[in-house]
């Protein structure tokens, strides 16, 4: 591959991708969303128009769908599992928490879709997003209408290590939506990690996690078992086809 020869003619698709690729040496990301492939700390991020909304964008991380955002419409959640999270959290807040003083932590940032949603739904809430990829965090701030800190604060770090630093009873809601590819890192699914999460929750607090799994539900069963070791009340939300083992889902 080191042999120097005439470069083959690139296809139109390859030329387009190369044109849209952002040089890693740029010190400042583009302002506003622009379709293209962008180098990030953990690989590549691709930003694609969703084809349905004028300002709708789909974010892919290393080829896997990560987030969907409609600029100017933070309460529009396109991913079904995010709508489930929103419904569960809002119901729990109404029954058990003070909506005026919410402290919400998001493990896994992506495009900060859920943080944007809750910052808009609860204007006085404080949302902390823990994102592993520093470059991605920089990009999404430039691309999308994410409220500034303290409404939405992005903290760069590994989710497990950062969670271990949380003071006891310092969070009202903790949302785990962390993936490496299409799988949650094992270290974030253990009983030990779950105990760390529980210790960080204030009385009446809620831990809600996104579990991607196949038809056998092996991962979901293991996660439920770990949760039941720590929490008194555990609930699983999914569509019936997934619970019946007919397809992969969240």
Give the residues covered by each predicted segment.
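Rossmann-like AdoMet
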Residues: 1-95, 117-121
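The AdoMet/dcAdoMet-binding core of the Class I SAM-like
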Residues: 38, 53, 72-203, 215-218, ...
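A generic fold-level signal
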Residues: 42, 99, 246-248
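Short, histidine-centered active-site or binding-site loop motifs used for metal coordination
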Residues: 63-65, 178-180, 211-213
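Short, solvent-exposed coil/turn elements at secondary-structure transition points
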Residues: 64, 160, 240-242
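Short, structured loop/turn "capping" segments at alpha-beta junctions
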Residues: 150, 207, 234-235
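Conserved beta-strand signature within the Rossmann-like core of class I S-adenosyl-L-methionine
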Residues: 204-211
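Substrate-binding/catalytic lobe of Class I Rossmann-like enzymes that use SAM or dcSAM, i.e.
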Residues: 212-214, 218-250
